[in-house]
Amino acid sequence: MESLTLQPIARVDGTINLPGSKSVSNRALLLAALAHGKTVLTNLLDSDDVRHMLNALTALGVSYTLSADRTRCEIIGNGGPLHAKSALELFLGNAGTAMRPLAAALCLGSNDIVLTGEPRMKERPIGHLVDALRLGGAKITYLEQENYPPLRLQGGFTGGNVDVDGSVSSQFLTALLMTAPLAPEDTVIRIKGDLVSKPYIDITLNLMKTFGVEIENQHYQQFVVKGGQSYQSPGTYLVEGDASSASYFLAAAAIKGGTVKVTGIGRNSMQGDIRFADVLEKMGATICWGDDYISCMRGELNAIDMDMNHIPDAAMTIATAALFAKGTTTLRNIYNWRVKETDRLFAMATELRKVGAEVEEGHDFIRITPPEKLKFAEIATYNDHRMAMCFSLVALSDTAVTILDPKCTAKTFPDYFEQLARISQSG
């Protein structure tokens, strides 16, 4: 297996221009494909997840052109639901941001499409979404294990009253919201349980509005969507920088700044993960907000005890930043870490212990007490891009760290380690 050893980093300083947001990129691609008119997307993320979405759109007959660096995409909208001319199988890797929205959107009209992916994708639950789509008339068959991909979709979604469990993944609701306006009838979506990762729903609603569709949001408990609508291209659309990707550089500055400035997101960003900066501030770092940047300066970091449900992805970065904070850090209400690219609660606890931390792993929380001195370790990344990026922060100590399978960052940030090196100074 490939590995990368990061030598101790004495200081970080500089500016990072963030790659486009994964969440925004894949939503924008799908809406542009469903819309009337041509859409030009700029600052599109070039990563595995986005490539899986683009490949699926190609197979579904959507035509688009990409710039040489794959960050500008011109899409000719289909002007309505996507149809495959014949039976089709789409391979979506481990891209939840492609699997969930396509599983819903391809239930409009009549299709015969199989959605499948990597072995890990077949372990990521999709039953709550399928249950909701079936309530709206969709014909969906599980081809292997009940409640998990691969799925066979045979159309039939017409709208109506639909309940969806919000407690596992907000992507299920996102998928329904993006699909419902194109259904022939009105759809009323009721949320069962507590809705996790609410800010991701705001990204979805924001993008739908950009593409000309508004819905009625009743306190995130119920959503009323008029049927028979169509999406309209906004012409051009700039994809925000990825706020989850920003978290590693901001945390690095909090630990070993200097000052690091990330551009492409700012105080008005639609991504909930910008609230990560508030957590660093609470821990003792100095944060400065601009319209299109966030900067962070080093501070003496203290432990925190917080509910992290609103920033599940960026909260992982706090778990490794906790190695540099005084006291015991507790991150709560993060059960959905367990259904991501890997079981992130288990993975995080296991690898933090390797570098010497004392860790308590609960059903939906993690408690971390840092050691006096970090130990050298080889970090397993579980084919999870965020594990690789989080544990790069260990090098901000006087201990080197080896990251196994460093290329797994390609899911959202192919040149992450090059960018980190660019702002790093060794002792």
From Swiss-Prot:
SUBUNIT field: Monomer.
Work out whether the entry's keyword set contains Amino-acid biosynthesis.
Answer: yes
Q: Which GO terms describe its cellular component?
A: cytoplasm
Main localization (coarse): cytoplasm
Q: Which InterPro entries match?
A: Enolpyruvate_Tfrase_dom (IPR001986), Enolpyruvate_Tfrase_sf (IPR036968), EPSP_synthase (IPR006264), EPSP_synthase_CS (IPR023193), RNA3'P_cycl/enolpyr_Trfase_a/b (IPR013792)
Question: What's the protein called, per UniProt?
Answer: 3-phosphoshikimate 1-carboxyvinyltransferase
Annotated keywords: Amino-acid biosynthesis, Aromatic amino acid biosynthesis, Cytoplasm, Transferase
Q: Tell me, what does this protein do in biology? A: Catalyzes the transfer of the enolpyruvyl moiety of phosphoenolpyruvate (PEP) to the 5-hydroxyl of shikimate-3-phosphate (S3P) to produce enolpyruvyl shikimate-3-phosphate and inorganic phosphate.
Q: Does the keyword Transferase apply?
A: yes
Binding residue positions for 3-phosphoshikimate: 22-23, 27, 169-171, 197, 313, 336, 340
> Organism, per UniProt?
Escherichia coli O127:H6 (strain E2348/69 / EPEC)
The residues responsible for catalysis, as annotated, are 313
Against Gene3D superfamilies, the record matches this protein to: Enolpyruvate transferase domain (3.65.10.10)
Q: Where in the cell is it found?
A: Cytoplasm
Listed under GO biological process in this entry are: amino acid biosynthetic process; aromatic amino acid family biosynthetic process; chorismate biosynthetic process
The GO molecular function terms of this record are: 3-phosphoshikimate 1-carboxyvinyltransferase activity
Name the Enzyme Commission number(s) assigned to this protein.
2.5.1.19
Q: In which pathway does it act?
A: Metabolic intermediate biosynthesis; chorismate biosynthesis; chorismate from D-erythrose 4-phosphate and phosphoenolpyruvate: step 6/7
| Reactions mediated catalytically | 3-phosphoshikimate + phosphoenolpyruvate = 5-O-(1-carboxyvinyl)-3-phosphoshikimate + phosphate
Point out the gene that encodes the protein.
aroA
Q: Which family does it belong to?
A: Belongs to the EPSP synthase family.
Question: Which residues are recorded as binding phosphoenolpyruvate?
Answer: 22, 96, 124, 171, 344, 386, 411
What NCBIfam families does its record include?
Answer: aroA (TIGR01356)
